[in-house]
């Protein structure tokens, strides 16, 4: 099997480059992949260390570096090695500059901008943590989104992912034979989304969870009929109230969150900024 080596170089956390690389790699499932992460490369000394690693492990280089001197050094080095060197956002920045008529700033300020978006994100993360798994249900009116679904349908990580995008998300588990809280219907301003999953897949996930915790007594947790009933009931609850339902069986957390955000902003007639 072919192996593809990719070096992710950034003057920040490499998340932007990583997302771009993963999106592209999703189109090449038949090859082995090896990603090398090189974050916080902000001077020539650090860059030279990375260049030596690239020289020993030839592969595609993806980068986001604002400093012009560092960019030139990196691209020149890769050119001499005859390996691809791709700026992930360079084309975007250039087109923005051309379209707006605004010159690209030559100096990069590495001080993080603590603006409203930053603090909104912190507040949303705090909210997601405090309102995880049905906690503090008396504060649901403060949420933007409420997720409901059986246990292990990725409600918690989805809530956190939404929080990183500035949305306050609470999540409430649905448990078989337990009455669903009536108060949730009073929160008419919130988007309520049901998460369901293929019962067989959910049983696999729950069994893995029980094995990890070394628990062998909770048989109802992995009983097919009960698991299937939980998913059916969540669909029923949502359909009766015109709440959207998302099947997460084959979706990543990022995909689920992205779909929820699309529903949220369409519902609120907003655009994500």
Swiss-Prot record:
Q: Which Pfam families match?
A: Kinase-PPPase (PF03618)
Molecular function (GO) terms for this protein are: ADP binding; ATP binding; phosphotransferase activity, phosphate group as acceptor; protein serine/threonine kinase activity
Which residues are recorded as binding ADP?
Answer: 149-156
Q: What class of enzyme is it?
A: transferase
Which domain of life does this protein belong to?
Answer: Bacteria
Instruction: Name the catalysed reactions.
Output: N(tele)-phospho-L-histidyl/L-threonyl-[pyruvate, phosphate dikinase] + ADP = N(tele)-phospho-L-histidyl/O-phospho-L-threonyl-[pyruvate, phosphate dikinase] + AMP + H(+); N(tele)-phospho-L-histidyl/O-phospho-L-threonyl-[pyruvate, phosphate dikinase] + phosphate + H(+) = N(tele)-phospho-L-histidyl/L-threonyl-[pyruvate, phosphate dikinase] + diphosphate
Instruction: Write the record's keywords in alphabetical order, separated by commas.
Output: Kinase, Nucleotide-binding, Serine/threonine-protein kinase, Transferase
In the record, the note on similarity to other proteins reads: Belongs to the pyruvate, phosphate/water dikinase regulatory protein family. PDRP subfamily.
Protein name, UniProt field:
Putative pyruvate, phosphate dikinase regulatory protein
Q: Which organism is it from?
A: Rickettsia typhi (strain ATCC VR-144 / Wilmington)
């Amino acid at each position: 099997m072919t192996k593809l080596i990719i070096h992710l170089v950034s003057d920040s956390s490499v998340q932007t480059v990583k997302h771009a690389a993963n999106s592209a790699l999703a189109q090449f499932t038949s090859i082995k992949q090896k990603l090398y992460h090189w974050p916080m490369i902000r001077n020539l000394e650090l860059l030279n260390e990375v260049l030596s690693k690239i020289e020993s492990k030839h592969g595609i280089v993806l980068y986001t570096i604002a400093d012009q001197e560092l960019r030139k050094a990196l691209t020149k080095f890769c050119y001499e090695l005859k390996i691809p060197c791709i700026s992930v956002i360079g084309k975007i920045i250039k087109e923005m500059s051309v379209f707006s008529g605004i010159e690209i700033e030559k100096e990069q300020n590495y001080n993080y901008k603590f603006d409203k978006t930053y603090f909104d994100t912190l507040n949303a993360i705090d909210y997601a943590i405090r309102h995880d798994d049905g906690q503090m249900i008396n504060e649901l009116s403060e949420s933007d989104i409420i997720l409901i679904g059986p246990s292990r349908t990725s409600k918690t990580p989805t809530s956190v992912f939404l929080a990183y995008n500035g949305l306050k998300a609470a999540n409430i588990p649905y448990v078989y034979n337990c009455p669903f809280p009536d108060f949730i219907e009073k929160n008419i301003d919130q988007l309520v989304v049901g998460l369901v999953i293929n019962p067989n897949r959910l049983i696999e996930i729950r069994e893995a969870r029980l094995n990890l915790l070394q628990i062998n007594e909770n048989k109802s947790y992995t009983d097919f009929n009960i698991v299937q009933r939980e998913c059916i009931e969540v669909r029923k609850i949502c359909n009766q109230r015109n709440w959207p339902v998302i099947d997460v069986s084959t979706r990543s957390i990022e995909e689920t969150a992205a779909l929820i955000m699309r529903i949220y902003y369409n519902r609120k007639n907003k655009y994500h900024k």
